[in-house]
Amino acid sequence: MRGLRRADVEVTLIDRQNFYLFQPLAYQVATGSLSAEEVAVPLRQIVRRQQHTRVILGEVTGFDLASRHVVVDHLPDGTRGVEIPYDALIVAGGSRYSYFGHDEWAAHAPELKSLAGALDLRDRILLAFEAAETETDEAKRDAWLTFVVVGAGPTGVEMAGQIAELGHTLRREYRSVDTSKARVLLIEATEHVLGAFPDPLPRKAETQLVSLGVTPMLSTTVIDIDAESVEVQTADGSRTRIPARTAVWAAGVTASPLARLLAQAAGTETDRAGRIVVEPDLTVAGHTEVFALGDMVSVRGQQLHGVAPVAMQQGRHAARSIQRGTREAFRYHDKGELATIGHKRAVGVVSGVKLSGFIAWALWLGIHITYLIGFQNRLIVFTRWTFSYFTRGRGARVIHS
């Protein structure tokens, strides 16, 4: 949208939600560091100065590439089957977490790809501490104080670290239970956390996690999840059922259903993760007016991670292509990657330089403040983080459920 704000075009933005979620900070909503309104901005507020842009609240359920229109259902008044014409189309449906064929686990281990998931997790985490406070049976209390995070990519690592820190923050607010002794188990199927990061950063991240009280369980896979436990299997085949009342899912992703719909409409292929395969210029094969972006796509000849910087650069590339009428190959400029673990703890690579500790943490904070949409949100988040730095407090701990 920003790339087209000065272009001589009419823009129609269609989304089933009326807000944009800054996903990299969703886990801070889940752990009470930030409120929902600080990481989610109304779409109409974002484009309020772009008079050539209109917003439609609805869900895209079909594409007719021959006649160049999309089909929209679930409008606010219940209308279905509305056809929206286009000259150029950009599809950026994102992705969702994959439960590897066990969608029933989602009821017991919510994900962090959505604002609803983050708010659900916040309620579950805070309610777990409340339940532990009144539980007299020691085994049941331990289960309430055991938190399992599945997946040790950046989101899983950040979530595990934040839950551990939350336990330390709350210890003076409870009388019958020591929240700082909460167990946080980080389950990862591979041999290291942050497997996409270069050595020695995964090992440094593991050390920092352990210092916070997180227990990494590596080379371990999840076999089953229910409301009261998580069953895991280690590399030697042995199985263990862990009593735990709170689980978080951050393992594996699959493309948005829009990828499959678009691929079917174009007669093109998808990969194993359900992502539509697009040309190097980000257009759909045979349709130079249709662009697909972000982690719902696989670009021919390129291996790109499903992270926000990739999608942002792809968005700018598509906007330039539409304005100039050109179709040049997309080239990703990798500026690095950072993962925060906790207070003054982080690891990352920036411009080829490997960083860890306070410097990496400060860079992470600065970069994420910069990418937030809206001056007001940047100011509020900066103020909250500054307050938290000096007091270790968390001001967004209201239970809604």
Task: Please tell me what each predicted stretch does.
Residues M1-G62, F147, P154-F197, V248:
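Beta1-alpha1 glycine-rich phosphate/pyrophosphate-binding loop at the start
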Residues D15-R16, G93, A152, A189, ...:
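Cofactor-binding loop segments of dinucleotide-utilizing enzymes, especially the Rossmann-like FAD-
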Residues T53-V148, G237, V248:
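FAD-binding core/adjacent interface of flavoenzyme oxidoreductases
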Residues V55-V72, P76-D77, A164-P280, G286:
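A Rossmann-like FAD-binding core segment of flavoenzymes
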Residues G94-Y97, A160, V253-A255:
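Short glycine-rich anion-binding loops that position phosphate/pyrophosphate groups of nucleotides
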Residues H108-T136, S229, R241-Q313, R320:
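FAD-site-proximal beta/loop scaffold in flavoenzymes
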Residues R141-F197, L201-T207, T215-M217, V307-S321, ...:
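Rossmann-like dinucleotide-binding core of oxidoreductases
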Residues V310, Q314, A319-S401:
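C-terminal, flexible cofactor-proximal segment of oxidoreductases
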